Design a protein with these regions (language model features):
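Cytoplasmic helix-loop-helix junction between adjacent transmembrane helices
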Residues: 123-157
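Conserved MFS/SLC helix-loop-helix module at the cytosolic interface between two early adjacent transmembrane helices
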Residues: 78-116
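Extracytoplasmic gate region of multi-pass secondary transporters
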Residues: 47-48, 236-288
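Helix-loop-helix hairpin linking two adjacent transmembrane segments in secondary transporters
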Residues: 115, 146-147, 154-207
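Helix-to-loop junctions at the C-terminal end of transmembrane segments
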Residues: 79-91, 287-300
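C-terminal transmembrane helical hairpin of 12-TM major facilitator-type secondary transporters
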Residues: 301-345
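Residue-level signature of mid-helix packing/kink "hotspots" within the transmembrane helices
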Residues: 45, 73-81, 164, 281-289, ...
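A late C-terminal transmembrane helix in Major Facilitator Superfamily
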Residues: 356-391, 398
Length: 422
């Protein structure tokens, strides 16, 4: 049965609509958007292959290393709630540009010797990415409304591609140059600066300047939805989407932070372990790009999230039984499963919202609460590894999280809008 979306909410129609680019400028805008999205996982993915070296050189404990990996994810959640206020102040296009510049600065700062700079730079980068995370679905809705499915796929693809690029190159670059991890991590500020440069035409275009000067009105106004402001927080579908976002992100960031260390502990070299993390992103890129298409085409909406959970479970079981000998097989399964889950989680935010107004509200809730759940992944895995002295218990816990993720998918995949009366 095809879902008939309700008419656009009055509040949505009263929000200022940013003009969408056309022709050659539409291509330029799409490329600039994708380059910006590419940077939203680089800062996290570039750290994990050299986390052992960072831990040694900065004299961090296992808890400290886990905390360092957790800081960005905490920021993704905590500062997601700040993004709507900043958007009203600066406009979405200018705010993204500022976020990219802040991201570059944070990446450089974390490479300065000393734990304060390391954690401070990581914090700044995390705040910048948090703002970008919330802005991207909003920009898709405003600038690419006619191509939302395609741009959502490009967004998911760019996230996975950035992670693959950073995880795969950081160790070879450090080895080839002999610079060590600090200058090589600082190099990842260059893509952020390139993205900021590519985004400049979006700020300089006359229609963009006028659009960004028009600040959105407050959310609660005459004609807005009659439900109470906090009613979304009492909606089952909204919580299902939020929990699915949080639980799949927990597994993703746990693996992103600790997979190279796990494989090194089982005998892999630093370069091989970093490559395996990068390799897992390639099937993930394809799966995340296909996720919006699968959401729209498959009649049984629960099949894609179930497939994602089964693929992830295959990878986790492989890490328990033969992490090195079957590494390529397990990384393929894990990459496909996590890539599909990421694409589905982002897609649910759009699909379960009746209009742009609710998309913004659900995006803030799902990413804010979701990433606060996700921060338990890197920190929790580090603590479990320290407590147990091995990786079996942490991986078993990730399997248990998969069960909860699958349960959340039942509600998130239902063909129902948030705040629907029935």
């Amino acid at each position: 049965m095809t879902h008939q979306a309700p008419a656009a909410h009055p509040s949505a129609s009263r929000q200022p609509s940013l003009p969408g680019p056309t022709g050659a400028r539409a291509v330029q805008a799409a490329l600039a958007f994708s380059l910006a999205a590419l940077n939203l996982r680089i800062a996290v993915a570039s750290l994990s292959p050299v986390l052992a070296e960072v831990e040694h050189d900065e004299h961090l404990s296992s808890f400290g290393a886990g905390a360092l990996s957790t800081v960005p994810v905490v920021c993704f959640g905590a500062f997601a709630f700040l993004a709507p206020r900043l958007t009203r102040r600066f406009g979405p296009h200018h705010l993204l540009w500022y976020a990219l510049l802040a991201l570059a600065g944070g990446i450089v700062l974390r490479s300065v010797p000393g734990a304060p700079a390391l954690f401070g730079g990581t914090l700044i980068a995390g705040v910048a990415i948090a703002v970008g995370n919330v802005l991207m679905p909003q920009l898709i809705k405003h600038d690419f409304a006619g191509r939302a499915g395609l741009m959502l796929g490009c967004y998911s693809l760019a996230l996975s591609g950035g992670a693959a690029l950073a995880a795969g190159l950081v160790v070879p670059l450090a080895s080839a140059t002999g610079w060590g991890w600090r200058p090589v991590l600082a190099l990842w500020a260059v893509p952020a600066l390139m993205a900021a440069l590519a985004w400049l035409p979006e700020l300089l275009a006359p229609d963009r300047r006028s659009a960004n000067r028009r600040r959105p009105e407050p959310v609660q106004r005459e004609g807005a939805d009659t439900a109470a402001p906090g009613s979304l927080w009492r909606d089952r579908t909204a919580w299902a989407v939020t929990l699915y976002m949080g639980l799949q992100s927990l597994g993703y960031y746990a693996i992103l932070s600790w997979l190279p260390t796990l494989l090194r502990d089982h005998g892999m070299s630093d370069g091989e372990a970093g490559w395996m993390l990068s390799f897992s992103s390639f099937p993930g890129m394809a799966a995340s790009f296909a996720a919006p298409w699968l959401q729209q085409r498959l009649r049984r909406a629960f099949v894609p999230p179930l497939a994602a959970s089964l693929l992830c479970a295959t990878g986790f079981v492989g890490l328990l039984t033969s992490p090195v000998s079957g590494a390529y097989l397990w990384m393929t399964a894990l990459g496909l499963g996590q890539g599909l889950a990421i694409g589905l989680a982002l897609g649910y935010i759009v699909a379960r919202s009746p209009d742009a107004h609710h998309t913004g509200r659900l995006s803030t809730m799902a990413q804010g609460i979701g990433y606060l759940i996700a921060c338990l992944g890197p920190l929790g895995l580090g603590l479990l590894h320290s407590a147990s002295g091995g990786w079996s218990l942490p991986v078993v816990v990730l399997l248990a999280v998969l069960v909860a993720q699958t349960v959340a998918a039942f509600g998130a995949s239902r063909d129902r809008h948030v705040l629907a009366s029935s």
